[in-house]
Amino acid sequence: MSASPTIKPTPAHNAAPTEPPIGMAGTTLAAWMSHSRWLSVGGALMLLAMLPTFALSLLHRQQFNGIDAYDKPLKFQLSLGIYLLCLAWMRGYLTPAGRARRVALLTDVVPTVAAFGEMAYILWRASRGEASHFNIATPLASALYGLMGVGALLLVAASGVLAWLLRRHASPGLNAAFLTSLRHGLWLTMILGGVAGIYLSGQTGHAVGAALGGVTNDAFGLPLSGWSRTGSDLRVPHFLGIHAMQFLPLFGWAASRWWPEPRAILSVHGAAVAYALLTVLAFVQAAAGVPLLFGL
């Protein structure tokens, strides 16, 4: 009786684990919910809230500083919604053990609660035609503004905590260049966005340069953003800092597709330095009272 032939393992048997798709930590709603129910639901609700806010802007005509008072709530709802959903997406690159750590609450529950607290205050002030930021007219207004500032710090701190968690608990097999871009973007959001926000909150307004002939009325701002064209605007560097967590991962995703890993990683480092310098330059320009487009 002849012996049974020995079955040799095929390459498929010894194949390395499939690398997770670069830039995709699960694209279904169920996947995002598994990463963070708080962030996913919170981000979606924040974006959906733009619909009733827009309706309010049509039904309740309220002006503030030359523009519709509901422009600011709409912009913040868009920005905060994207921020929360980005955190939910990036948490998908953590191992289950990383997401289960107690400190991970700072990237989940805490920023969601802080975002809705800040949004409620901004919307309430808008409905009254009053300033939400820089409003220290009364002791109550000063206290509420300070509380909103604490919430804003908790929001940007969440990005730094997530960057630290991705350093220690990133999913195995993740492309190194893309992972580097995630961490760089999150750190820059916390540092640049946080520093610009702290400086901005200590001023009497976002516009600089009125004494140099600039116009601080927001009615003369750029389309969509509302940034001043005649005076400088401290919101520009704050915007760049806060959104580093979207720009750099997008660059890292592209770099990991175009170049070999060592070159892609080096390009991500270079992009992070360039982005930081651009943000610092925008801050120096704004603080000096020079318009973003030099008055064009």
Task: Annotate each language-model stretch with its function.
Residues M1-H35:
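Short, Lys/Arg-rich, polar N-terminal cytosolic tail immediately upstream
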Residues W38-L58, Y70-Y93, D108-A126, L147-W164, ...:
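Hydrophobic cores of alpha-helical transmembrane segments in multi-pass integral membrane proteins
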Residues F64-P73, F134-L147, N175-T180, F294-L296:
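Non-cytosolic membrane-interface motifs at loop->transmembrane helix junctions
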Residues M90-V103:
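Membrane-helix interface/capping segments
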Residues A176-R183, E261-G270:
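Membrane-interfacial entry segments at the cytosolic side of transmembrane helices
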Residues A177-L212:
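Aromatic-rich transmembrane-lumenal/periplasmic boundary elements in polytopic membrane proteins
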Residues S201-A244:
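Membrane-interfacial catalytic/cofactor-binding modules of polytopic membrane enzymes
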Residues V284-L296:
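Juxtamembrane boundary at the C-terminal end of a transmembrane helix
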